[in-house]
Amino acid sequence: MAKTHEIKVERRADEGKGASRRLRHAGVIPAIVYGGELEPVSIQLNHEQIWLAQQNEWFYSSILDLNLNGDVQQVLLRDMQRHPFKQLIMHIDFQRVSANEKLSASVPLHFINEASSPAGKSSEVVVTHELNEVQVVCLPKDLPEFIEIDLSTLEVGAVIHLSEITLPAGVEIPELKLGKEHDVAVVIAKHGQVEADDVADEAAEGDAK
C-alpha cells in the first residue's frame, strides 16, 4: 500500500473570480474537492505548502489525506492549473476516493539496474524509455506510489512490453484488455547503428517527397 500524505485545508467562504484573485494575492490557493456521495466543497490551501509538495512525485500519484478541521478525506489530485509564466498555482481539483471502489490513476515508472545490464554496459546500445508512467486501476489501498522495472537482464535488441511489467497485487493495466495492439513497448534496447540507419532512412524518405 502506498504511503498517504496529509495536507491541511480550510473551507472557502467566498467564491468567484474576485475572491479567488484575493486569495492568490494572500498566498492561498483556491481549490475544490468533489466525488463520492458528498457534495463538492470549495476549499483553500497554503500556497507555500503546496508549492513544496508538488515538487514531489507522490503529490501526483498517491492518495492524499485532506484534513479539513479534523475531518480527513482521502483524495487524488485530478487537476492543477498553473500561471503561464509565474511560479504560481492558480487552482486545484481533488477527487474523493472510496475504500471499496476501484479508481483509475497514473503511476510513475521507475527503471533500475539499467547501467549494470548487458545492454547498459555496451557503449553501442541506446536504451530508450518509451513510457514514464502507466494508467492503472485498483482499490485505493493497493495504489502504488510508483512501479519499479528491473532492467538488470536487459539484452541488446530486447523490447520490454506493457504486459511484461510486474504489477503489485491488486493492480491492473486496463489498456491491456483492449487487444494486443495496446501492448506497447515500454523499454527498447537498440543498437546505435540500427538507430542511425533508421534516422538516415527517414531523412531519405523526407527528401524523396
Curated annotation (Swiss-Prot):
InterPro entries assigned: Rbsml_bL25/Gln-tRNA_synth_N, Ribosomal_bL25/Gln-tRNA_synth, Ribosomal_bL25_b-dom, Ribosomal_bL25_C, Ribosomal_bL25_long, Ribosomal_bL25_short, Ribosomal_L25_dom, Ribosomal_uL5_bac-type
Gene3D superfamilies: Ribosomal protein L25, beta domain, Ribosomal Protein L25, Chain P
CDD domains to which the protein is assigned, alphabetical: Ribosomal_L25_TL5_CTC
SUPFAM superfamilies from the UniProt entry: Ribosomal protein L25-like
Top-level division of the source organism's lineage: Bacteria
UniProt GO MF annotations: 5S rRNA binding; structural constituent of ribosome
Coiled coil: none
Subunit details: Part of the 50S ribosomal subunit; part of the 5S rRNA/L5/L18/L25 subcomplex. Contacts the 5S rRNA. Binds to the 5S rRNA independently of L5 and L18.
PANTHER family: RIBOSOMAL PROTEIN L25/GLN-TRNA SYNTHETASE, ANTI-CODON-BINDING DOMAIN-CONTAINING PROTEIN, RIBOSOMAL PROTEIN L25_GLN-TRNA SYNTHETASE, ANTI-CODON-BINDING DOMAIN-CONTAINING PROTEIN
Main function: This is one of the proteins that binds to the 5S RNA in the ribosome where it forms part of the central protuberance.
Protein name per the record: Large ribosomal subunit protein bL25
The organism of origin for this protein: Xanthomonas campestris pv. campestris (strain B100)
Lineage of source species: Bacteria, Pseudomonadati, Pseudomonadota, Gammaproteobacteria, Lysobacterales
